[in-house]
Amino acid sequence: MSYTRTVHSSTSILKMNSALQISCLLVVLGCLLGSGHCQSEAEFAAKSREIAQMFGNPSVDKYTKARNLPALLAFYEKYSSRLRLTPQERNSVNNAMRQYKAQRNQQVDGVSAQGGWLFDIIKSAISIIVKAVE
């Protein structure tokens, strides 16, 4: 009787261990990224509904909308790439946001600008964003 003995070199075992470790790492990363994407999708959907309810609802008064403009700005800055906007709409919204921020940062006697006229600056941008999230 003859016995055949397979001899594995130490380098082939190391290569196999490395490949196994890398594949496990890739699986873990895939799971983490996938769950993160799902969470961000759910967050985007929830924030979109909030924005649409706040700014798309004609029964919400102008002052409530003006008070919530920072939330709209934050939403647009975070999710602008997910909104289906034409290049012209995107440019219009970006210009309105820049103008709003410039006016908001302007101070008179050390006090930021007050009043509802700031809301009028980005009124068209609001309608574009609301249309995109609905």
From Swiss-Prot:
Gene: TotE
Record bears the keyword Secreted: yes
Major place of residence: secreted
Segment forming the signal sequence: 1-38
Source organism, top-level taxon: Eukaryota
TM helices/strands, residue ranges: none
Keywords: Immunity, Innate immunity, Secreted, Signal
Gene Ontology BP annotations: cellular response to heat; cellular response to UV; innate immune response; response to bacterium; response to heat
Protein name (database record): Protein Turandot E
UniProt subcellular location: Secreted
One cellular component (GO) term of this entry: extracellular space
Function of the protein: A humoral factor that may play a role in stress tolerance.
InterPro entries in the cross-refs: Turandot
Family: Belongs to the Turandot family.
Coiled-coil annotated spans: none
Pfam family membership, one: Turandot
